[in-house]
UniProtKB/Swiss-Prot annotation:
Gene Ontology CC terms: membrane
Source organism, top-level taxon: Bacteria
The UniProt record lists the keyword Signal: no
Record's protein name: Oxygen-dependent choline dehydrogenase
Family, as annotated: Belongs to the GMC oxidoreductase family.
Keywords of the record: FAD, Flavoprotein, NAD, Oxidoreductase
Gene3D superfamilies xref list: FAD/NAD(P)-binding domain, Glucose Oxidase, domain 3
Reaction catalysis annotation: choline + A = betaine aldehyde + AH2; betaine aldehyde + NAD(+) + H2O = glycine betaine + NADH + 2 H(+)
E.C. designation(s): 1.1.99.1, 1.2.1.8
């Protein structure tokens, strides 16, 4: 075999690409090339390794592509942040470390589409378990020996977590002890991708650490893939930039595009696979007219409902520079303390209406008042709920703007384009205010800081959303799986109309899942890895899961409104 020839070439060492690299390299008779545009995941860089420092990578460009959207027409024409991970681990290197799998009905919904029948929740659950090591042990829902370490919430954490969960229950919503178990719906503790010694459990740490010493796996960082190379309709390799040089690598079997929901459609389009009219605008030679590439883009939008805290128990002191050396030292030496947690240790999922079949609103509770990216910190003790709708009907697109591989694409999520979006965000604000008025928070709850208690009408709440809602950093669905005219890949990630080419990442989701996307992305990569290797899929299980079936979304007689 030539030095630049491999059986598989994987483009993107993120949440999916690292899974594929590790699993494919388990077969000693194949060779794998893993290309990553960013650098290593430096283990001594607290910005990516300390869970509490999660805002730092979003503030620079070493680990963040720092995309911006086109002006969003329903959001006061704001150009909105669209951070994506750069470096070994991809977005698992810079995300919030919330381990949320989604709702069982998300996957049953995928499987309701013709040709996707093998994507039910009970087909996917074995792969969630395969990927996971949960710190309190395995059960029917959780794994005990997978590459991704999952930490559960422990006694003695910030008292605001328990108070906010209890307030949700007092407002009439269910309590759940496991947001990834039998019943996602309700309020409860949140699992996190954090190791036993308080480090971020990215897919680089979980998967590549197991695989990188294998002689059949080659990892190249600072490698910006320009385009996929084709012979007719077959992918035969890639061209990439590395330290100023243009290099080609040949793929004997397949090219696997794992660059994420923004960069995967961009790479396909730059390579000549996409909507022909878009490609002609930039004189990109057409390889295959596939109009769904870059379409169907989805995300979660969220807002911060913030309150003053009357007792000095919030994390506000940890934001003061003079307290941070001690926090960092405890974390570095012992892997404990404030630094060892992402501080998203409680949350929930609710249905805002009884006729919603599964939760349409997600909560993350945070014992400090601050933006996700570390900006706009409130200079007092405070706490907040991150509140966002889960399955917006609004759809956007990713569109190539240049043949330059270093140029950013045009990104439009088209946030809040549907009347349902506005109804759900108004409901979310009003329900959150009910939760915050419950007795469990009486000793902590001060005045409402944002949106502000004076904002009550639909028009006032809508204005707040337009000005203040932000991305939850969950882009997806832009190379969707399926068999309709706008589908890009089949049920195993193979690009329609092509040979030797797959897309495997969050872009192939037909519809966004209910919650954070890291765990589902790892799962789908595990599942497709078996198919690439020619292995039988793990057997469908019969584990029970909750379905509301018209049950009331809350017990209103118990709530303080």
């Amino acid at each position: 075999m030539a030095a630049n020839e491999y059986d598989y070439i994987i483009v993107g060492a993120g949440s999916a690409g690292n899974v594929l690299a590790s699993r494919l390299a388990e077969d000693a008779d194949v060779t794998v090339l893993l290309l990553e545009a960013g650098g290593p995941d430096y283990r001594f860089d607290f910005r990516t390794q300390m869970p509490a420092a999660l805002a730092y990578p979003l503030q620079g460009r070493r680990y963040n592509w720092a995309y911006e959207t086109d002006p969003e027409p329903h959001m006061n024409n704001r150009r909105m942040e669209c951070g994506r991970g750069k470096g070994l681990g991809g977005s698992s290197l810079i995300n919030g470390m919330c381990y949320i799998r989604g709702n069982a009905l998300d996957y049953d919904g995928w499987a309701a589409h013709a040709g996707l029948e093998n994507w039910t929740y009970l087909d996917c659950l074995p792969y969630f378990r395969k990927a996971e090591t949960r710190d309190i042990g395995a059960n029917a829902y959780h794994g005990g020996d997978g590459p991704v370490h999952v930490t559960t919430s422990k006694p003695g954490n910030n008292p605001l977590f328990a108070a906010m969960v209890e307030a949700g229950v007092q407002a009439g919503f269910p309590r759940t002890d496991d947001l990834n178990g039998y019943q996602q719906e309700g309020f409860g503790p949140m699992d996190r991708t954090v190791t036993a010694n308080g480090r971020r459990a990215s897919t680089a740490r979980g998967y590549l650490d197991r695989a990188k010493a294998r002689p059949n796996l080659t990892i190249v960082t600072h490698a910006v893939t320009d385009r996929v190379l084709f012979s007719g309709k077959r992918a035969v390799g890639v061209s990439y930039l590395h330290h100023g040089n243009v290099l080609n690598a040949q793929a004997r079997r397949e090219v696997l595009v794992c660059s994420g929901a923004i960069a995967s459609p961009q790479l396909l389009q730059r390579s000549g696979v996409g909507r022909s009219t878009w490609l002609r605008e930039l004189d990109v030679p057409l390889v295959h007219d596939l109009p769904g590439v870059g379409e169907n883009l989805q995300d979660h939008l969220e807002m911060y409902i913030q309150y003053e805290c009357k007792e000095p128990v919030s994390l506000y002191p940890a934001l003061q520079w003079w307290n941070q050396p001690a926090i960092g030292l405890e974390w570095m030496l012992n892997g404990t303390g404030i630094g060892a947690s992402n501080q998203f240790e409680a949350g929930g999922f609710i249905r805002t209406r009884d006729d919603d079949p599964w939760p349409n609103i997600q909560y993350h509770f945070l014992p400090v008042a601050i933006n996700y990216n570390g900006s706009n910190a409130i200079r007092m003790h405070g706490f907040q709920a991150h509140v966002g709708s889960m399955r917006s009907p609004s759809r956007g697109r990713v569109k190539l703007t240049s043949r330059d591989p270093n140029a950013h694409p045009g990104i439009l999520f088209n946030y809040m384009a549907d009347p349902l979006d506005w109804r759900e965000f108004r409901d979310g604000i009003r329900i959150t205010r009910e939760i915050m008025r419950q007795p469990a928070l009486d000793r902590y709850r001060g005045r409402e800081l944002n949106p502000g208690a004076e904002l009550t009408t639909d028009e006032q709440l809508d204005s707040f959303v337009r000005m203040r809602a932000e991305t939850a950093f969950h882009p997806s669905c832009s190379c969707k799986m399926g068999y309709d005219d706008m589908a890009v890949v089949d049920n195993e990630g193979r690009v329609h109309g092509m040979q030797g080419l797959r897309v495997v990442d969050a872009s192939i989701m037909p519809r966004i899942t209910t919650g954070n996307l890291n765990a589902p992305t790892i799962m789908l990569a595990e599942k497709i890895a078996d198919r690439i290797r020619g292995r039988e899929a793990l057997a469908r299980v019969d584990t029970p899961y909750f379905v509301a079936n018209g049950v009331a979304s809350r017990k209103r007689e118990s709530a303080t409104v």
